[in-house]
Amino acid sequence: MSVELWQQCVELLRDELPAQQFNTWIRPLQVEAEGDELRVYAPNRFVLDWVNEKYLGRLLELLGEHGNGLAPALSLLIGSRRSSAPRAAPNAPVSAAVAATMAQQTQQAAQVVVPSEPIVVPVAEPVLSEVEEPSSRDSFDSMSDSGSVPAASGRTEQRTVQVEGALKHTSYLNRTFTFETFVEGKSNQLARAAAWQVADNPKHGYNPLFLYGGVGLGKTHLMHAVGNHLLKKNPNAKVVYLHSERFVADMVKALQLNAINEFKRFYRSVDALLIDDIQFFARKERSQEEFFHTFNALLEGGQQVILTSDRYPKEIEGLEERLKSRFGWGLTVAVEPPELETRVAILMKKADQAKVELPHDAAFFIAQRIRSNVRELEGALKRVIAHSHFMGRDITIELIRESLKDLLALQDKLVSVDNIQRTVAEYYKIKISDLLSKRRSRSVARPRQVAMALSKELTNHSLPEIGDMFGGRDHTTVLHACRKINELKESDADIREDYKNLLRTLTT
C-alpha cells in the first residue's frame, strides 16, 4: 500500500469535508508504508480516537476503491513517522464542551475498527464569553537594580519575575479578558471549549493549543482568558503573554547584553507561554531556531504553550517545517467570524457594560451590516453611542444611519447584487447568465437560491427588487429561495459550508 495512494485518498476526502474539519482532524495525520501496511500517525490520543470513530471508515472505502479493490492493512498510532517509535497514548481528559462541539461539527460517522481506551469526560464549567484583542506590551528588560515593578492599575495586570539577578520579565494580562466576558457562538464554540480545557487542566489538556483565524475574532481574548484563569487557580504561576515580535526583540536584546543563557533559562522556566501572531516568526531563522528549542523544552517539561496565528500553521510561508510539524502535536482550532446571532449578543453585552440602552432592533440593524470582525462591530457601536450622547438622542435606527452613514455606504458599495451573482457563479463554476436564466436543473437552481439568500442578507434591496435582478422573478420565488436555504443550512453540511465560505468572501 503506497503513501501516494493514501495522499490521493486524503485529497478526495478534502473535497468531501468542510475546511475546518479537514484541517483539524485529517491534515495533522502522518503516514508511512511498512511493507503492505500503512501506518497512520496522529499527534495525540484525542485526534486518533476522533479519526478512528468518524473518518476511518470513509478512508478505508476510498483506499479500497482506488487500490484495485484490495482491502488495505492500516494501523492507527500516536506519534510521528519521524520518531523511532510511536508515543504511548496519554490519558488526557476531554471536556464535555469540546466533545459536544466536535460531535456537532462532524456529519458522517464511520465504522470503528481500532479499539481505544475510554475517555474521562469532566463537566466543564458553563461560562459566557466575549471577543476583543488588546495590544501586547514590553516583556523582557535589562535590570539596573533588583526592585520589582508594582501592579498596574486599571484593565491590565503587570507581573514581574526576577531571573538570575540580571534580567526581569514583565507579563501583561488584560484582566477584563476572561471566559466570563467572552460571548460564545457557533463560530468560536470549539475554540472556547478547547481554551477552557487547557485553562482548567493545563497538565492534561492540549499542548500546544493553536488558535488561528482572521483579525478581531477573539484569539487574543481567549489566550488572556486562559492566562487569567491559570493565575486565579495559582497566583504564583509564571504565566507569560507576549507578541511574537516581542520574543524576537527580547532575543536580540539578550544577545546585545551577552545574556542569551539567562534568556533561555527564563523562557524555559515558565509554567505557561502564550505567544500571539506566530506568523511573524516567518523568515526569521535565528528566532525560529531559538523558539524551536524553547518549544521543545517546554513540552518536554510539561509546561503549557498556546499560540495564535492569522492562518493555518501549514500555510505560514517562511516557517520551518519542523516547527509546523510540532505545532500539530496538540490541537489546532479555527476561530471563525461571528454569525448574526453572536454579533447581536456581542453588541447587547457591550451596550450593557457601557450602561447604554440599545434596542434589540437597533443591535440587529448594526449586526446585519457590520460582519467582518468583532473589532469593527465594537467600533461601530462606540460611534453610535458617541453620536447619541452628543446629540442628546436615544439610539434608533435613524440615528444609527446618521452616525454610520460612511460605513454603510461603503458596505453597500462593496456588497451589491451584481457582486454576489459574480461571486456565486465563480464559486459554483457556472455562468452568471445561468443564474438569470429559467433553467431549473439542480446544478443551477441551488446556486441561484444561495445567491438570492445572500442578496437578502447582505443588501437593503426588497424581495421584488432582488427578484427583478434575477431575471425578472416574482418576490415569492425569492422568499421561497431564502426559506429553502435556511432549512438546508440546518440539515445539509455542504450547503452550510458553501454559504459560510461565500459570506466570508463577500464581507471580508
UniProtKB/Swiss-Prot annotation:
Natural source organism: Pseudomonas entomophila (strain L48)
Share the domain note from the entry: Domain I is involved in oligomerization and binding regulators, domain II is flexibile and of varying length in different bacteria, domain III forms the AAA+ region, while domain IV binds dsDNA.
Organism domain of life: Bacteria
Chain segments carrying region Domain III, AAA+ region: 172-388
Q: Report residue spans for region: Domain II.
A: 91-171
Assembly information from the UniProt record: Oligomerizes as a right-handed, spiral filament on DNA at oriC.
Q: Which parts of the sequence bind ATP?
A: 216, 218-220
Keywords of this protein's UniProt record, alphabetized?
ATP-binding, Cytoplasm, DNA replication, DNA-binding, Lipid-binding, Nucleotide-binding
Location of the region described as Domain I, interacts with DnaA modulators in the Swiss-Prot/TrEMBL record: 1-90
GO-annotated biological processes: DNA replication initiation; regulation of DNA replication
Protein family (similarity comment) = Belongs to the DnaA family.
Gene3D superfamilies noted in UniProt: 1.10.1750.10, 1.10.8.60, 3.30.300.180, P-loop containing nucleotide triphosphate hydrolases (3.40.50.300)
Classify the main location: cytoplasm
Read off the Pfam families from this record. Answer: Bac_DnaA (PF00308), Bac_DnaA_C (PF08299), DnaA_N (PF11638)
Q: Where is this region: Domain IV, binds dsDNA?
A: 389-508
From the UniProt record, report the name of the gene that encodes this protein: dnaA
Functional description taken from the UniProt entry:
Plays an essential role in the initiation and regulation of chromosomal replication. ATP-DnaA binds to the origin of replication (oriC) to initiate formation of the DNA replication initiation complex once per cell cycle. Binds the DnaA box (a 9 base pair repeat at the origin) and separates the double-stranded (ds)DNA. Forms a right-handed helical filament on oriC DNA; dsDNA binds to the exterior of the filament while single-stranded (ss)DNA is stabiized in the filament's interior.
Q: What is this protein called?
A: Chromosomal replication initiator protein DnaA
Cellular-component GO terms for this entry? cytoplasm; plasma membrane
